């Protein structure tokens, strides 16, 4: 179900309008998600807060109000869901999380199809211990900033 997703602003105000002109430069091979390592819409300060996931901190409010959990598949944009296959939609069957298995396995360096596969595997085998393991692995993933853009 859709909900208001809180983040600190890391992009210029006209980022969504500029996205259309940048679609040709999408580095995501499958086109469902939009990723660019050197996205010109991201501010200098935005690069810093994204690298260390500081922009994600407001999502703790989403957890408190029950829209999200600490661990679970990352919430997609409605425009991304519109391009999902039935198989991709399986990742929408659980509450989204601030961190997830592919966040601790390479973050944005992981292609979308692999993200979906990892999310589905997580959904099938989730447990308190697995969530604790993912939370522990999140700390070094955030501190190194590897794969964050």
Predicted regions and their residues:
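Conserved small/aromatic sequence motifs within transmembrane helices
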Residues: 1-149
